[in-house]
UniProtKB/Swiss-Prot annotation:
UniProt GO BP: phosphate ion transmembrane transport
Gene that encodes the chain: pstB1
Keywords from the UniProt entry: ATP-binding, Cell inner membrane, Cell membrane, Membrane, Nucleotide-binding, Phosphate transport, Translocase, Transport
Assembly behavior: The complex is composed of two ATP-binding proteins (PstB), two transmembrane proteins (PstC and PstA) and a solute-binding protein (PstS).
InterPro entries membership: AAA+_ATPase, ABC_transporter-like_ATP-bd, ABC_transporter-like_CS, P-loop_NTPase, PstB-like
Cross-referenced PANTHER family: ABC TRANSPORTER I FAMILY MEMBER 17
Family in the record: Belongs to the ABC transporter superfamily. Phosphate importer (TC 3.A.1.7) family.
Protein known as: Phosphate import ATP-binding protein PstB 1
ABC transporter domain boundaries: 27-272
Purpose: Part of the ABC transporter complex PstSACB involved in phosphate import. Responsible for energy coupling to the transport system.
GO CC field: plasma membrane
Domain of life according to the entry: Bacteria
Organism: Nitrosococcus oceani (strain ATCC 19707 / BCRC 17464 / JCM 30415 / NCIMB 11848 / C-107)
Chief localization: membrane
Binding, ATP: 59-66
Amino acid sequence: MSRQETTPYTLGEIEQGTPCCVPKALLRVRDLAVSYGEITVLSQVSLDIYKGCITALIGPSGCGKTSFLSTLNRLTDHHERARVNGRILFDGQDLLCDPVDTLRLRRRIGMIFQRPNPFPLSIWRNLELPLKEHGVRDRQTRYRKIEQALKDVGLWDEVSDRLGISALVLSGGQQQRLCIARALVLEPEILLMDEPCSALDPISSGVVEELILRLRGRYTVVIVTHNLAQARRVANYAGFFWMTERVGKLIEFGQCQHLFETPSHELTAAYISGARG
């Protein structure tokens, strides 16, 4: 699916966080539960992820937001004690029950982690490697995709004359943008972001946030953030997670503006106001 595909609402309406019609649910989660060994960390989570929108997941540390994010492209498979139950419906397939090619899935649903994690390779190789891994053999095609991804994250003008240097010499903010470019180079349909600004200084954090805003409407983004102001600035939809009887649960989900201004649940209101959390 092309990232240029038109969304059913205008960019202006997206920026206001209020779609002009009900957007398409690209991914549906129903009754999701996650356990590690005997410990249940997440239970009874149901929500829709809407195409072309940014969905922010908020709530205190330890309430299951990152575990939830990791289920969406099956990264929980890497934890031998993880058990995931429920349904995750994507493109007519239940990702938890049907046979899934996880390599292809992670091309379609990319992940950006909390701390920048560039490979200890050149800038160019950081972006070329995933393309080769996913079967892009033509060098000109790889160059075009790499150039576009670096332009998308605002790095091209900064690094185009030194693509052969180690990615590890870049600043923290540049490294995080490179990691985002590494995901975008595969043209995913959904981009998962686990606190992408939390390890960055305020200036770098602002640059990454501006990048996220530029992605809105072109990509479907799910972002975990503890920065409530950031969630309110960037998101169309928001979900509030909370610990109930030592298990993380989704307390409230809806349009971001509504959740922040007129929350339906007293726990949501208390957390947003700073009275709880």
